[in-house]
């Protein structure tokens, strides 16, 4: 879920026989429910709100099943479930472990009342512990469980796995929610699946490295693929393709009849950037920097103004836009509903589980240019029960919707809470019986009927039957192709395209009046290797032209550049989907495409379109044109950052001469242009001349008091700017800028200036400088703080502040404790130092300090969470407690520091009990992306924090308090995972019981 962000811990439940207790879905309790009553299966539906016109019934629940992670529904209407009892046990060592392993369950309704009558164990073993995906294809079941993908086969029809085979292996993310997800059967007869950014790499069943058709390694190595990926392959795993990449945790890909791919992707916790994606084949979706692999928070030219958009590098050329951004959340399973039992608003649309918001919803789309827009329509949501956590959705053969509910108090990290619960719901029109008859597949006509079914498993059987029949099924498929339903027509076309005369059907479909059929035909032609020349370059539909561009990806056809140019000439300057399709189509052939395009007349109707194509291009021929755009006097150079950013996507040997040339311009705002050029240039490439020094000095004035000023001073080692740096610090800019400026000042030899101010009469200035040193936290600043603490010449308040600021970082805590341990701490600082060290987030230092200063409270115990929940908290006081204990690392609204996960909507995501658990036991639920790492540097210093970004040359580490430090990899002696959460253990005991209750009350009130 958002990782999945389920918290499980399940008591062993043994179902020895196939019979299961039929769930009772009718509550017998009148009036409001107690907490205990609300958890009972018979009250499950009472806590939910269903879309008008639909009815939700409880199909199955505990004890028959527990913690469903993924679900599929077979052609008989049976529900298959992967469970996760053995979930993240290494992170939760106190929880029981089922030695027999986790289970695959089959649930069946025998009498059509919409409630499961039997629960069978299909397979149980530790090799599928906490599996994240299941796909039922006839007598074969594909199960996704990193590091493997298994195919289980029931050879004798007894609903037991008789054979286990590997499909893929070597996938990262063992016991991780960002790992391999569910497979699905596509309308083209291929398998589609994805993994999140813990998947990392994939090997074939024999352990061999897999490369794409171009010979490129399929792995998160930036050659070219990064982070999470979508894949397509044959049923036997051969011909693996990367369909798109650079996602964070793309959870489950859904494929419609036309071959369109849809999925969700979640953000780094708390950044309100969850997204829904429409997939352009071979697209880059921007989670990390395409070239360097740097994270989204790393500063770059033309950085997006808001974090939700910055999160996906949406201002960068080469990043496909998002269909929809839905704020915070924990997205899980998705399906395209191609049935007609549900109301029209849900038909042919994505349906999706969002446990972070306790909702199942659809995203109805409308075509717009080369892409889509989307809205949100809820189907099923929590009304009173915040434990409702939909982990997957599926469509039954009768068209009803099934929802798997993980059922847990929280979604966040790898912590687990509930021991034995899990539910399956059925959503259908009120009074709708659940009657399913297995498909009859004796004839082609039978199979065509089954091919129309909304259930994927049924369609797989139909597709396989028709495909195996070959030409003998042609007549029935042609009849289906001429039906009035575009999705039936598309399914028929896919099969017709695979016949010996399939090229004829494809070429006919390319001229069809329905643009979706034309798009399907393009995809079928690409798979079949059918060429069609310039047939589509003047197609009236921008969506068809978009697909024609995507089909040009790595094409070797002689007329491809000319056709690409004609399609480029029709770009309107507004449609980002179309622009990115142009970029994908020209990939590996930019020089020829760009040359062909430049030979065409300029786009007088949409002149901005030509500028965008230059910006998106990846050929040296575009660089002089980029420079010309920057130098146009009618352009506001303040808006030229997007053009300067484009230089980052070229090798320095190509971009440097053009950037140096920009320094010689005569624009009315030339200093600003020069400033941006200096930002983009490599310092070693700059001629060291007096003229260049003057240009650089003038450029600095453009960025005075801004981060870019410090960047330039540090980049070019400008010691003559130390006074200005000092003044920047004293102007009290934002936290990160102030620490960065202080670090840069000392790097540039500015320590004498700092000491002079500390010894001066301006007390306010001295206090500001000490705060800045604490934010910097590098060795020179810590040494300066230590010297200040020990020197009684300085006034006591300043030295107290120095002690507090030394105790803000990993090494700083050690330095301060060392003064205590070695009896070097002046006695008048004992009280403040005790306060700092006994509240330290560095565990080893805190333990020593508490034992030294407060031995009586070492074993202070809190009452059980159940008792804390019964105490009423005070929200206003909880806000004050947050400011005292939490705001140095967390944001809540506009208050606090952006270090740990933002808590602005935490009350929508976690129940009170889950919030208590997260505070009391932080090690049990570390959010993905916030895992700590301990770095030992070659100079002897140490750094602890989480990795915000990483490139081939350096690692950007965020330390407690929100300060960042960039570590050159060549300066790192060792790196190892930190075994604890960066959130300090014992925080709950550092405050009073009532303060803890008030804090939780406040956090629980923070909702969307």
Give residue ranges: language-model regions.
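C-terminal motif of bacterial Sec signal peptides marking the signal peptidase cleavage site
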Residues: 16-17
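Beta-propeller domains with acidic blade repeats across secreted/periplasmic ectodomains
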Residues: 22-446, 465-468, 894, 968-970, ...
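C-type cytochrome heme c attachment motif
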Residues: 423, 495, 880-894, 901-921, ...
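Positively charged n-region of N-terminal signal peptides that target proteins for export
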Residues: 1-5
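Sequence context surrounding c-type heme c attachment/ligation sites in exported
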Residues: 397, 404, 873-887, 894-917, ...
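Long, ordered, helix-rich scaffold segments
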Residues: 404, 420, 427-881, 899, ...
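C-terminal capping alpha-helices of c-type cytochrome domains
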Residues: 59, 139-140, 148, 191, ...
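Sec-exported extracytoplasmic/periplasmic mature domains
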Residues: 154, 569, 587, 807, ...
